[in-house]
Amino acid sequence: MASAPRVSEVLTKKNLPPLSLYNFYIYIRDEENAIEFLDLFLDIMLHKFLFREHIRGLYKAGVTSTSLNTESSSTLGPHHFTRFRSASLSLEDLSTVYWPNFGPLLLEELSNEQTINSSDLLLSKDRAAYLKNLLTSNIQSLTQESTVISKEQVKMFTQIIIEKYFNPASPHEVMLPPQLVQPILDCKEHQRQDELRLFEDVETYLLNFLLKPAYYRFLNHKFKHNLNPLTCTGRFIIGYVSTFAAYWLGFCGIFLDYSRRKRVWTLLPFAFGFYNLICTWSKHDPVLALLGYSEVKPFHYEKVLQPSIRLSLNRRAIFVLSIIVLIVGANTAIFSCVPSIRL
């Protein structure tokens, strides 16, 4: 795994599949059952990004450093923003511009049904699928002079994050150490939701103690496996039934005195059965790997574009195929070559 990308590269969508943010999101959701933590981390990234864009907009508009310091300490009055009113983005525009870069940005609260693709997302609740279909090249540029983020918009985003993840009454509440949560709640009470470093300690905790360990498990999974666990369950059932049928046909061929030419056809159910059973055991489909594909969700495949991942999967595919051929060949030879006897 020496050539594997860092977790920061995956979280900022700078890497190729299967080590992509979309796949990492699916893994955290299905395997780690910690999707709320990843959602929170992505939304904190968005909070920092919006704050910096807000500061950049103030600089472009000619705000002095003194005014900027006053703004960051939450003492800047609303009259300073009247000059930017014609250039400010609406909240609906913000959801379409900033959401795609960072993934799950509380879309249920921030977007309306007229926003592109948002209505489908609200119905399906599949935020991971929305991540996959987005292309960074199609996102509106944030460097336009006409786009300015206001203080009120930053505070509104912050308020939504606090209410969703730190409110005990919220269904999406994340369980974090009290020493991390209490300062955030105190800022809410004192109306200081526009501070850049408000979520800094939470971000560090999530990255170092939750996301990095999960990412190493994600890497191990992608380097060794290319099947979804739900598919493995189905493959096990199919393989078990097929293998049972192969043994049943093999014994019938022996005790009903069938010729060896006929009994050799037990090769087919043995091959089909053991292929699925061993794929389930290894969570690896060798044919799929040699074709260069990996299963993300049940019956949903994507091309493996990461060279190191593809090389690792191909090596494992040869090993798994060797085991399958050995077991199938041994069973076929036994049931074909054993002398038959009519009972």
UniProtKB/Swiss-Prot annotation:
TM region(s), chain numbering: 236-256, 264-284, 318-338
Keyword Transmembrane found: yes
Ranges in the topological domain labelled Extracellular: 257-263, 339-343
Keywords from the UniProt entry: Cell cycle, Cell division, Cell membrane, Endoplasmic reticulum, Membrane, Transmembrane, Transmembrane helix
Subcellular location: Cell membrane; Endoplasmic reticulum membrane
Gene3D superfamilies on file: Regulator of G-protein Signalling 4, domain 2
GO CC list: endoplasmic reticulum; endoplasmic reticulum membrane; plasma membrane
GO biological process: cell division; protein localization
The RGS domain, residue ranges: 109-228
Topology term for the membrane: Multi-pass membrane protein
Topological region Cytoplasmic: 1-235, 285-317
Record's keyword annotation contains GTP-binding: no
Domain of life per record: Eukaryota
Protein purpose: May be involved in cell polarization and division.
Name of the featured protein: Protein rax1
Species, as recorded: Schizosaccharomyces pombe (strain 972 / ATCC 24843)
